[in-house]
Design a protein with these regions (language model features):
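Membrane-interface helix-loop-helix junctions at transmembrane boundaries of multi-pass membrane enzymes
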Residues: 67-82, 189-212, 260-261
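Specific aromatic-rich, kink-prone transmembrane helix
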Residues: 15-39, 241-244
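Membrane-interface anchor segments at the N-terminal boundary of transmembrane helices
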Residues: 149-207
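Short acidic/glycine- and proline-prone juxtamembrane loop motifs at membrane-interface regions
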Residues: 2-13
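Transmembrane helical bundles and short interhelical boundary loops of multi-pass, membrane-embedded
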Residues: 58-65, 74-84, 88-92, 97-111, ...
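Membrane-interface alpha helices of multi-pass inner-membrane proteins
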Residues: 26, 33-53, 57, 218
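Hydrophobic transmembrane alpha-helices of multi-pass, membrane-embedded glycosylation machinery
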Residues: 41, 53-64, 236-239
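Transmembrane-helix signature of polytopic, lipid-linked glycan biosynthesis machinery
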Residues: 214-229
């Protein structure tokens, strides 16, 4: 649901999600030059891609220092800083080409030196985003994001033409509830198995990706408790929530249950999630429905 809503609205978060996923995939495939380009493009969409860059650099350096003797650390370390330091910065600056070539860009004329204007622009953006504390009726603490405690209403009207005296039309930036509620449990399970693998010193690539995605996409927001933030930011780590669900489904399929039973349970779960998505589709797409039908979809009072 959340991805669908983003795909129909003019926000940068979906483009950010695409390039971040591409970067993480390429990084996982050891295609580091391409990953550096992809994460640079992601940073060109929104600065929050930096958290994924930091996570990938941290893991890459950990692997280098744990696998190479001290005499062989210099070359691979320098290479990683070029791939995930110099290259993303160059790509990010290149993404500003239109601004540099135009005389009408925001703050472009702040200084006769275009680079000074660019730095000033960044200073203003940083000040705005770190100092944004104005109250908003749909702001939501990151603690509530996983369970869709306070989804963001992008649009609401009470039009006519639904066959009833009272009609409603809303675009609610909310994930499919049952998917996210189950995903919350799945993420907790995945983290538990990841910690067990860490203690046993075994490598679990799937779990590593899930934890990296959740740590980089979700965890940083908890450090902005006074800032005005919204649930729809969660789209960046939704793919990793789904990966956690897939991981748990695989655990079930590989369990001691008879294959027919485990497959039936997984199929039933997927079916329920699909039906839940269809049920909420009208408020994902802004369909005109009766007020009573809209109210039936407000399972929590905090969704109103």
């Amino acid at each position: 649901g959340l991805v669908l809503v983003h795909s129909r609205t003019a926000l940068l978060d979906l483009f950010l999600t695409f390039f971040v996923l591409l970067a993480v995939y390429l990084w996982h495939q050891q295609r580091h030059w391409l990953a550096g380009i992809a994460i640079g493009l992601a940073m060109g969409c929104k600065w929050s891609a930096v958290y994924f860059l930091v996570a990938m650099v941290f893991v890459s350096l950990y692997r280098i220092f744990s696998k190479h003797p001290s005499k062989e650390l210099v070359r691979p370390t320098i290479m990683k800083f070029i791939q995930y330091g110099f290259l993303p910065v160059i790509v990010y600056i290149t993404s500003w080409t239109g601004w540099f070539l135009s005389n009408r860009g925001w703050d472009r004329q702040w200084s006769s030196n275009s680079f000074s204007s660019w730095i000033h622009y960044h200073s203003e953006m940083l000040g705005f985003h770190t100092g944004l504390t104005e109250k908003h009726s749909y702001q939501a603490n990151p603690w509530s994001w996983m369970v869709m405690g306070r989804p963001t209403s992008f649009f609401y009207e009470s039009p006519k033409g639904c066959g009833s005296d009272n009609c409603a039309q809303e675009v609610l930036a909310m994930g499919t509830p049952l998917l996210w509620w189950a995903g919350t449990i799945a993420v907790a399970v995945a983290i538990g198995f990841w910690l067990r693998a860490l203690v046993k010193r075994t490598n679990e690539p799937a779990l590593n990706l899930i934890v990296l995605g959740m740590a980089a996409g979700y965890l940083p927001w908890f450090f902005f408790q006074s800032r005005t933030v919204f649930t729809f930011y969660a789209v960046i780590f939704e793919p990793f929530v789904i990966l956690a669900l897939v991981y748990c489904a695989k655990l079930l399929l590989d369990s001691s249950l008879k294959s027919g039973i485990s497959q039936a349970l997984v199929a039933a779960f997927v079916t329920v999630i699909f039906l839940n998505f269809v049920f909420f589709l009208p408020i994902f797409t802004g369909e005109v429905i009766t007020y009573d039908a809209w109210l039936q979809r407000m399972w929590l009072s905090s969704w109103i």
